[in-house]
Each structure stands twice: as C-alpha cells, then as structure tokens.
Amino acid sequence: MSCTNSPEAVKKLLENMQSDLRALSLECKKKFPPVKEAAESGIIKVKTIAARNTEILAALKENSSEVVQPFLMGCGTKEPKITQLCLAAIQRLMSHEVVSETAAGNIINMLWQLMENSLEELKLLQTVLVLLTTNTVVHDEALSKAIVLCFRLHFTKDNITNNTAAATVRQVVTVVFERMVAEDDRHRDIEPPVPIQGNSNRRSVSTLRPCAKDAYMLFQDLCQLVNADAPYWLVGMTEMTRTFGLELLESVLNDFPQVFLQHQEFSFLLKERVCPLVIKLFSPNIKFRQGSSTSSSPAPVEKPYFPICMRLLRVVSVLIKQFYSLLVTECEIFLSLLVKFLDSDKPQWLRAVAVESIHRLCVQPQLLRSFCQSYDMKQHSTKVFRDIVNALGSFIQSLFLVPPTGNPATANQAGNNNAGGPASAPANSGVVGVGGGVTLLPAFEYRGAWIPILTVTVQGSAKATYLEMLDKVEPPTIPEGYAMSVAFHCLLDLVRGITTMIEGELGEVEAEGPSVTEGASSQSSERRDEQAASDPMDQETVSRAVWEEMVSACWCGLLAALSLLLDASTDEAATENILKAELTMAALCGRLGLVTSRDAFITAICKGSLPPHYALTVLNATTAATLSNKSYSIQGQSVMMISPSSESHQQVVAVGQPLAVQPQGTVMLTSKNIQCMRTLLNLAHCHGAVLGTSWQLVLATLQHLVWILGLKPSSGGALKPGRAVEGPSTVLTTAVMTDLPVISNILSRLFESSQYLDDVSLHHLINALCSLSLEAMDMAYGNNKEPSLFAVAKLLETGLVNMHRIEILWRPLTGHLLEKVCQHPNSRMREWGAEALTSLIRAGLTFSHEPPLPQNQRLQLLLLNPLKEMSNINHPDIRLKQLECVLQILQSQGDSLGPGWPLVLGVMGAIRNDQGESLIRTAFQCLQLVVTDFLPTMPCSCLQIVVDVAGSFGLHNQELNISLTSIGLLWNISDYFFQRGETIEKELNKEEAAQQKQAEEKGVSLNRPFHPAPPFDCLWLCLYAKLGELCVDPRPAVRKSAGQTLFSTIGAHGTLLQHSTWHTVIWKVLFHLLDRVRESSTTADKEKIESGGGNILIHHSRDTAEKQWAETWVLTLAGVARIFNTRRYLLQPLGDFSRAWDVLLDHIQSAALSKNNEVSLAALKSFQEILQIVSPVRDSEKPEPPAVSVPVPVLLGNLSGPGLSRPFVRTDSIGEKLGRCGSETPVVTDELEDLKLWWAAWNTWHRTGSESTEPPSSVDELTFIPSQPFLTALVQIFPALYQHIKAGFSMADLQKLGVILHSAVSVPISSDASPFILPSYTEAVLTSLQEAVLTALDVLQKAICVGPENMQIMYPAIFDQLLAFVEFSCKPPQYGQLETKHIANAKYNQIQLFAPAEWVALNYVPFAERSLEVVVDLYQKTACHKAVVNEKVLQNIIKTLRVPLSLKYSCPSESTWKLAVASLLKVLSIGLPVARQHASSGKFDSMWPELASTLEDFLFTKSIPPDNLSIQEFQRNESIDVEVVQLISAEILPYANLIPKAFVGQMMTMLNKGSIHSQPCSFTEAEIDIRLREEFSKMCFETLLQFSFSNKVTTPQEGYISRMALSVLLKRSQDVLHRYIEDERLSGKCPLPRQQVTEIIFVLKAVSTLIDSLKKTQPENVDGNTWSQVIALYPTLVECITCSSSDVGSALKEALAPFKDFMQPPASRVQNGES
C-alpha cells in the first residue's frame, strides 16, 4: 500500500486522472458533448482537490462519486473504445482505493448494464475482480449484484467467457471469505472468539459484522442453489449447476474451516444446510443395488450419477477432515456411508471412489486418531474407526470370494464385480490364460481367484485417480485389481500411519517417563474412556488410552485381511510388505503392552513360517492369540478367519522331520515359510524388547524350524547344519541351502543382539528359553532320543553376551540351571548343567564389569549366589563341582573377591554335618586357605562371617580334629584382629557409617548382631559368642579347648574393646555362657561312661557326663571371675555393674552349692578371686599396693591361663590402652555403690555358708557333706570380705557368721579323705579349716579393737563363739543326725577306694585349746570393757572352763585341763580386780557361785588319776593345785570385804577341806607318802592360819574374814586331833604314817601360835566365841599326851604351855563382863 500512498504515486495518479479525463473529453468531443463537459469539469475538480487538500487521496475518495461520474457516463455511450478507456480509468482509481461506497455502487450498476448488453464481458469480470480485491467498500446488495454478474457471465455461450467467469466466481467467493477472516483478525484483540460447541443453536444474522454477513449470505445461497432452491441474496441468478455449486462449497469448506469453527452462525449452516444437503444428494447412491434389475428395464430407483457422487465424496472428505469435532453425528453418518459404498452390491466405480476416499483418510493418522477419540472411545457410539478397518478387510475378502459378474452394462468395468456365481468363472479364466497360469505378474491368488497387484500410488500418499476426474461426466472404467490394490495400500498406509504416529508420540513420552510394561490389558480401553471423561487425567494417560483404543479397534480387521493377503500373495515384494505390516503392528502392540493383539500378529507370522497344519502346541493353545477357527465380527457379519490353505502354490524348498516325542512323517517348507522365518528373526532381532511373553511363541517356532532344517547347536552355542546321520529325512534344495548360512548367522546375531534388549524383554527371552529347555528335558526323561540342546545352548550364549548387565538375567538363568538342569536324573545333563553354571560364574567373575566387581558388591553377590545355591542340591557330584569351583575362585580371584567373600564363605559354611567326612574335609581345607592367606585381603565386614564359618566347623561332629583345629583357627583369627585392630576398626567404622546412612534413607534401623556396639567390638563379640557356643558343645574336649581359648582371647585382647562394649561381653557372652553351662551341668547324665574301645581309659574323675560338665563349669566360672577381677576398673563404671555383680554372685552361689566337690570348691576360688585381695591397677607397670593387712591363707593354686598353653596374663599395657583408656580419667566409683557390692557379696557368702553347712535333717545315702577344702575356702573368704563391710557389720551379721563357723567346724570328713586332711591324733595341729575359722575371729576382734565404741558390744559374741569352740575339747560337736566314728575305727585303706565312705569326727582338742588361748588373750585385752562386764563374759569363761576342770583326768587330752586351769588363773588374775571394782553393781553376783563350784570341782575332782601317772607328774599336778590356793590367798581372801560372804565361806570351807590330808583308796602303800598332796594341804592350812592372824583389820566389818578363818582353823585343828588320837589308839604298836605325824605336829604348832597371836590381839577384836573354841581344844590336847611319838610330844608341850593363862580369867574379861 505504501507505493500508492507515496507523494510520487499520488502525483502520478493525479496526472493520469487528468490525462484520462482529457482523453475522454477528446473522444466525446463530437458525438457525446455531455460527456465532454463532464470530463472537463472533472479536470477542474481534480485540480481543485489537489490544490486545497494536503491529504489528497482522502479528499479524492470523499469526492469520488463526482470524480468517477465522467467515466460512468463514458461507459454509458456503449462505444467500445470509450468504454475500454473508462473501465481502465475506473480500475486505476480502484487500485488506489479512492472509490467510496456510493461510487462503487454506481460502478457496479454501470457494469450490470454493460453485462446485460453483452459488452466487454472479459473486461467486466476484470473490473469486478479489481473492485472487490482492492478494497472492502462493496457490501450487501452491491456485492451480491457483483457476484450475480459473474455467475451470469459463467453461463454465456462463449467458452472463454464461461471459464473466465468460473475462475472469477471462485476468486470472488474466496475474497468474500478472506475479507471475513481479515475482519475477524481486526476484532480479535477486542473480542476474543468463542469456540463453537457442536450443538450450538443458531444466532441472529444481525449480530454478524459486515464482511461476515456477506460471507454468510453468500454461503447460504450457494447451499440454496445446490439444493435447487431460489437464492435469498444472490438476486438475479438465472442459471446454476449442482456440480459447480458443490465445487464452490468444497473450496470454501476446505479453505476457510476457521470461519465455521469460530462462528456459531456458520456452524449452524454446516449442520442445518450442508449436511442434510449432502445426505439428500447421496440418496441415489445409497438406495441403488447393482444387479437388482437389468439396464433395459425402467429403473424404479434413481441411478447414481458419477460427477455428483464423486464431488459429494470430496465434500464429505473435507467435512470429515475439518469438522468432525463440530459434526460428530453427521461425520458418523458420512463415514458409515463410505463404509456402505464398499458393499459388493454397489457399482464398481462407486466402490473404487469410496475406497479412494477411505485411502485419503488412511494416510491421515491424526484424523484417524480423532475418529477414534470422537467415536470409538465414546460410550454408545458407533465404532467408526473399527468399522472402517473391518470394512476394508471385508472388502478384500469379498473381492476374493465373489467371482466376476457377466452383466453387459458393466462388462467394461467388470474387473471382478461381485455379484455372480461360479458360472462366470470363464470370464476370468481368459485373463489367467494370458499368463499361462505361471504369470510373473505380481498378484494375489486364492481359491481360484487371481487378482493382479497394480501400482496405484506411492506409499504414504493417497493420489486418487477417480476422485480427481472433475471433467468426467460418465463413470470411468475401473481396471482389474485396482480396487484390491487401493485397499491393499489402505491397509499398508493405515498400519504405517498409525504406527509412525503412535511410536513418535510414544517416543516423546518415553523420553520423558518410564516405558510401558507388559501386561497392560488391551481390554481396558472402555474403562479408560470413562476415566478420561470423569477424571482430569494427565496428558500421557489420555494419549495412552487413545493409542490403545486405536490398536484395539483395528487389529482384528487388519490381522484378518493381512493374514488372507499373506496366504494369497504370490509376489515376494507384496509378501514382504504384508509381513512388514504384521511385524510393525506386532511391535507397536508390544510397545503398548497389548499382549493379546501382539501375540496374535506374532502367531500369524509364526504360522506363516511353519508348514500348513504343523502340530505346534504353543501356536494351537487356546489363547486369545489363537488364529485358527477364530471369528471376528466385521460389520455384523460373521467372517471366518481364513487359515493358510493347504493347496500351496509356493515353491517347496526343504523337507524335514518335525520335532516331537513320537516319530512322525516328514514336513515341507516353502520359500514363503523361509521368508516368514526371516521376518520372525527380524522381529526378534529388532523388536525383542517388546516381545515379552511371546518370546515363547517366537523361540518355539524357531526351534522347530531349526530342527526341521537340521541345524544343530555347536560348541559355542551357534547353530550349524547337522550331519546327514542326524537327519536322514532332511532334504534341502539349493535355494534354501544358500539361505541357511544367513539364517544361522541371523540366529546367532539374534542372541548376540539380546545385549541391546531392555531388561524386561531380556527376562522374557530368558523365560522363553527356560520353557523350551524344560520341554527338551521332558522329552529326555522318557526316551533315549537325543534332546534338543537349542534352549540350553542359547541360554549360555545369551548369558555370555549379556555379561555387561548379567544381573538382569542372572537369576532366571542360573535358577533354571540350578533347579532343573543340575537336578535332572540324567547325569550327563546334570553334569553339563553344573559345568555351565560354574562356567558362567567364573566368566562373570573374570569379566571387566563397570564399575569393577570389588566396587559393585550387589553384582558380585549375585554372581556368586548360584554357587551358594548349589549347596541345596544333594547330588554329591554337584557339591564336589561346587567346592572345586570355590577352590579355583580362591586361587584365581581370591585377592579380588572383595564383597563376594560372604557368599564364598557361605558355601564352605553350608556343608552340613551329615554330608560325609570327605566333603567336610574339602570345605575345611578351603577355610584353612582363607584364614592363612586371605584375611588381610577381604573386606573387614566379612571377618565376622569367617568367624561364623570357623565356628560352624567347630560344631561338626564328624571328626574331633577338625573341631579342635577350627578352634585353633578362631584363636589365629583373634590374633589377626589384635594385630590389625586399628586398620580393621577404621574400615568397619567407615562401612558402618555408610550402612547407617542407607538405613536412615530407607527409614529402617540398622540391624546387625550386638548393635549398637561399635562395629569392631561387634566383631569381637561375634568371636566370643561363637567360642561361647563351642563352650557348650556335647564333646568335653571341644568344650575345654573352646573355653580356654575364649578366656585367653578376652584376657589377651579384651582391652581393645570400647568401654561400653564390656556391658555386652558380660551380659550377652559371659553370663549367657554361664547360664547354659549351669543348665547343662545340672541336667547332665550321672550314668557312668564306659571306657572307649582300645587302650583309652577314662579317669574316674571324668567317667560321667556330669563330671565332664563339672570341669566345664569350673573352667567357665573361673574365667568369668578372673575377668571380673582383672577388668574391674573397666566394669565398675558401667551403669549396671551392681546387677552384673549380683548375677555373678548368684552363679558363684549356685556353683558353690553344687553337689560336685570340684565345682563347689572352684566356685569359692572364684569368689576369692573377685574379692580382689590385691586391687588391680590401671597399668601393669605400676607397683601393686601391698595386700590388705589380713593374713588370709589362700588355698588357690596358680590359675595358669586356660587354652593353648598361654598364661592368663593381664595385658593392660600402656601401649594398648593409649588409644583406649589413656585419655579417659579413671572413673571414681561411688563409695556407697561399692559398699552395696560388698554387702551383696556378704549376702552371697552367708547364703552359701548357711546352705552348705546346714546339717542334714535326716540321714540317707544321698546326704551331701561338704568337703574340708570347700569349707576352708569358704571361711578363708570371710577376712577379705570383712575388710570391705566392717563399717556396717552388725551384731546380727556376727551371729550369722557364728552359725556358719560353728557349723563348718562341726562337719565331719569322709574316711576316704581323712588320711590327706587329718593330722595324726597325737599331734596338736589344727586343720586348715580350724585355722581359717580362728583367723576369721581374729580379724573380727582386731577390727573391734580399733573400731568405734559401738563395735565393742560385739566382744561378748566373740567370746561366746570362742567358748563354744573351747567346749569341743571335751564334747565334740554333732553334725545333725550323722553318725561319726572315731578316726581310729574308720576304714580308709586304698583297696576299699570305692566302698561307701564313712564319716570321721575330727580331733577338736588342738582347736579347742587354741580357741581357749585366744579367749584368754582376748580377755586380757578386754576385761574392763563395759560390754564384757555387762554380758558376764568372765562368768561364761569360768562356766566353760568348769567342764574340763571338773573332768580333769577324764578329759580326752591331758593338756586340756592343764591349759584350762592355767587359763583360769590368768583370767581370774585380770578379772577379779574388775569384779571387785564392780562389786557394788551386782554385775558379778552370779559369777561367784560359778567360780566357787569350778574351784571346788577342780581341787576336789571326782576323776581318778590314770594308773600310769608318775610321781613327778603327780607332784607337778599338785603344784597346779597349790597355785590355785595361792590365787585364793592372794586375790580373793585379802578382799573379802568386797566379796559376797557366802563365797568367802565357801572358800574357807574349801581351804578347811584341803588342809586335811585326803587319801584316795587306790594308792599303794609305797605311794601314800607322795600322793597325799601334803604341800596342798599345808598350803590350805597355812592360808587359813594366815587369815586367822590378820592384824590389819581395823573394823569389825573388815575382820569377819579373820573370825571366819579362826573358826574354820579351830574346827580343823579339833578334827585333826580327834582323828590322830583315834588312829594312834587303833594302830597299836605300829607307827602312824609320816604325813599324819607331820600334820599333827603342824596342828599343835599352829595351836600354840594361835593362842600367842590371840593374846597379842586387842581384846575387843577377839570374839568371845573364839575363846570358847580355843578352850574347847584343851581336853583334846590332854588326850594326846599318851602318844608314842617324841616329836608329837615336844609339840604338845609347846601347845599346852599357853593354857596357863587360862587358869584365871583375865582382868579385861571381867571388866567386859561387868560392863
């Protein structure tokens, strides 16, 4: 437009206009003056406009009516020259758009007049065209008039004018619609278009904008005209043809679809006018039936008219293509009509144009997709797309089934018109005859029908022949085979189009998301439709639903048609195309997961590959894919699927045997079979990824073909033609011989190409091969015929070529070999399976995987897993192969096994106990190799498995040596852990962190044994646990070795453990082991085990299971106790140490109370161990502190370390602990907590002591009596224990202790043991037990001594305990009801070793005497203690000593009473002063009578001295008696005033009694001299005398002892004198004994001394009674005068002399009497 607006263009326009006007003026000068004037005034007008206006063009347009008037007048002259000049000038104005609406109307009116006068017709058309194309000022009636003008010119008699007018009409119609489109574009920004719904109602035309209204009126009138109705708008039309109208309608619909789609008014026209019009015009075609009447008879039905019909089909094509969304129902009708026109009763040309129309649709896959969406996927709607495909199939079948008709009216187009019967066969036979039946023309031949294949179009384009014949009036002649060829191309293009489209879209989706998986049901479309309608599904799901529906809709029809064509094809290219179509459909169905349809297409190809009626079960199975005898419903007709005909018109290329169990006849293969086979191979090769389960079909077919062709698997798995011997019936032509290498090569490449399959597809391939293999194995079961090795060979081949992703197929592949082949009864097949399996495993391990195997644990495990699975096969040959394979792997790959170790170790560990010694030995060799060579190379995470496997060999009971060696291996493993601890720990921690992270990501907790201990600690714990299991093995040797190793390991390497891990060691390992050992020990069999055969003897201490378990119990308990002792500093800070301590104590207690002496004694040794007499230090380099200062005799032997002759050492060296505890500060344990532990120990000790020493209530053979070593050990524990609890040790505890000590000492010993324990009876030696008891009490009294005041109340209890022991000297304790014998009477000779034991009482005298010494010693220290005073300890001592003192010579041991009296003297020397101090308190009141009785019983004992007592001994004994009297003299009588009078009286009486010689009747005459205790008597008398003359008395109260002594002395003198007189008288001449003479002399002297003393005493101090007694002596003295002894006489004289003073009473006396 810029060119017409530029100043230059405007200037030129003005010049041209003036020039035109001048020319017009010149031409009309003479003839037409008015025109001339108008022209001249026009010039002036133009000049004026140019001068006055800047916008010249606008001004011209405004005045255009005036400007154009001269030219219109010129046209009115009807002069050709002037008219041409004017029309040219008008066109120039139009081209510059300076014509107003009015001017334009005037121009059109002028043109109309010219048209009616038939002037300048071509120029008119040109002018109209310029007017309408250059501007938009012409509207409404002016426009309609212009269009009618063109139509009128179309129907002139001049062909040139007609054709030009036709072109102009077409152009004008286009312009009208283009204007509308431009108008819409202008208004689009203001009013966005509303999309038209298919069911929209008509809107008023008045709402349309001007251009739209014009277009609407024009289109409406075109419909009117085609329908032969009068136009509403195109007024003035005189003539119109239907064909031209249809062409115009088609062009508008085709060129301006958006007009109809965007405007409801136009869409209304489409629905209400166009569609009904088309349907009406189709009426003759629908109703017409070919052959219903002859052509000569009058036709009641209007015949189809080719030009109209063909144009209608073109319109329908446009309607369908552009407006299916608007015209859902109408398009459904049109498509149904198209399908109907294919019916065999329609004219041949109609069927041809219909199939061409359908072809047009078939090359538009997007259009087909729309049909599917709009119709097939809607409920209750015609399945249009399905019907089209089925109609094509039906059409093709009809062309084969119906021979040509002989109708002369259509003979020239017959080809094969479908209406006649067999009678018309000759018409066709001529055609066949031309080729002589062996024509080389491509054709389809089926059951006598021969149809040539014509080249009708290039594939992919629908170049129609008959739809383009717009100039033809008569129906064209259709060549033979044309319809078939077009229909064939329809099928191929349909397949190509939809597969290309869907695969393209599918590719885009798959590029974004996951691929479709097999199993998506092809039946799910309807359900998906509903979902698509109701749910806002995502685009992919909707698309997938459409694809699936399209395939579902068309596959049946396609397959029916293609199968028929395949069977009928005699042309290799056509066959290739058909097979390609089937192949692409199969591949597409596969990609969409439509299993049924995929399998159907594949089955068709498979059937085509095999000879007719070949008995292949996989193809004849009753699946949805089965083709034979299947009916598909096509357009309501039941059309049988045509199976391949047996009347083969193909070249036979091979004859062979079928693959079957039963021998059958031969079968023939044709070239088409081979072609199909190649397609099948191609399908498998290129589309293996989507074959899925149909691999079964493909491979089964290939296997049979291979067998028929005689191809056999060679060593590498490739197939080669077999030897003639193998297939005597196989005959191959040269034609197929050239194909065989190719086929063989493709087969090999097929399995090689499996490396390009996706994973799912590869699985399907493997599954199919496995199924084939199973078939072959089944055949091999029942007969000796060679099995087909196809499947197994290809399994191996597939495995080897897919090694890069072997994990995908590994499980099914190896699973099949493992579960089926390796377990086949046929040993060769089994062996082959094992060989294949191990080969695959080895190949897998040597393959360079990416990432490498050491970094790909999962893959390595996968590869090795079948090796492990072979363990489940029971055939020994397979197991041997397996272990050999393991050995090979270890030797070749051992260093790089990495993560594969667990499985390799698992294979070794899987050898079961019952699998024979040789397999176990082989497996154990593998393990030994691993432990010696490969521990450093394997991942640390596998070390635990090594431990488990080694442990499992320990549990094998086939051979003891293997078990013991495996325990040795465990020790070696632990050493390895110890040496490489740091490295192993780092690696394990790293692995643990990775696993922890994975577990957290998965949201699960880490699951490993002994979690949450650190991983390195877990390794140790597993080792300990495994050794723990072996510690309870049924075999004693294994138990012993395992126990020693366990405790050695913990002892030697335990410091490597984290502190917290000790908790697990204690609870999960040690206590768990103790529990199991205790349980086994307590339930073990007591039956005696017979000595084994040969020279093996079992020691009597191990001859029952119970005794053997006892050894284990001892070892275990000792080990645990040692750990508690040596690792106490580690264990005590643990949170629940006190609970652990309690459990350990419980174990010690239960063991200590065991009836087995070995166990019980060991338990006490363990108890002693854990009490830690010496506290452990943190580092062994520190000097150990001196032991607690308690002399505890320890019976423990040196507990040298158990296990492998390694000493039990504490390895807490600085080096080891630097990394462990060095940085930690020692944990200071709470003292209270510590105290609690010791009290728990005390309670355990108390319970153990109480229960073990409790005397039996009844006596039977089963009574258990604890041994002396046990009791000794028990008591020896106390002092150490007491050091920890003394602060809280109460009186009640002391009493408990006393009970135990008393009971322990009371226990007798077995006569078996007595020779080893008892000292000889004469030795005064204590047993260890007695020593221990006294030590315990010693510890106690020492602690009390230095302890606080409140402890001293315990002294009396100590005394009581000791005094109880003292009593044993005379009265040995009784142990319950047990009968004991004296040691001398017990039998303990060695010959009676196994006789029932007797119980021997011990010699308690030394013990009692030692106890007495302790009492004295203790009393000396404690006599003054308040408690000792209050609790009458002295009285108790005296009371206790009274027994041996009264027995005196009757005591079991002479030493006892001597010690007792000595002790009494010592005790009294200390105690009497104390008693005097407390005289007033009365605390000793009860003691005096006890003392008096004791002294009385001792000094005047009833026991008789033994006969063999020597004189010296007697004298020594008498001196002891004298000492006692001296004590009385020194300690009692001087303090008489502080002592009860009764007691003093008793003393005096006793002295009186003692002072008279007593003569036992048993003395011989010779002994009387010395046996009369002369010294004793003298001492008594002297004492009496001494106290008679005590001048110290100052008060009468203090003098009572003197008075008492005098009284006793005088009485005693009187008695002696009387007895002497009597004896003298009786003796006659015989002299009296010397002692008696001495005694009488002594008495006489004493009397004289007494009287002298009395005289000297103050008179007031002498009692009158005393004098009376003295005077009473006188008559007796006088009687003695007659005695014969001179000595007596002189003494008598001295005695009588003092009596002279009594002859007169003294003065004082008188005075006293007076006063």
UniProtKB/Swiss-Prot annotation:
GO terms for biological process: Golgi to endosome transport; protein transport. InterPro entries: ARM-type_fold, DCB_dom, Mon2/Sec7/BIG1-like_HDS, Mon2/Sec7/BIG1-like_HUS, Mon2_C. Residues 506-540 are annotated as: Disordered. Pfam families: DCB (PF16213), Mon2_C (PF16206), Sec7-like_HDS (PF09324), Sec7-like_HUS (PF12783). GO terms for cellular component: cytosol; early endosome membrane. It is found in: Early endosome membrane. Keywords: Acetylation, Endosome, Membrane, Phosphoprotein, Protein transport, Transport. The modification Phosphoserine is found at residues 204, 534. The modification N-acetylserine is found at residue 2. Plays a role in regulating membrane trafficking of cargo proteins. Together with ATP9A and DOP1B, regulates SNX3 retromer-mediated endosomal sorting of WLS away from lysosomal degradation. PANTHER family: GUANYL-NUCLEOTIDE EXCHANGE FACTOR, PROTEIN MON2 HOMOLOG. Homooligomer. Heterotrimer with ATP9A and DOP1B; this interaction is retromer-independent. Interacts with SNX3. Belongs to the MON2 family. This is Protein MON2 homolog. The lineage of its organism: Eukaryota, Metazoa, Chordata, Craniata, Vertebrata.
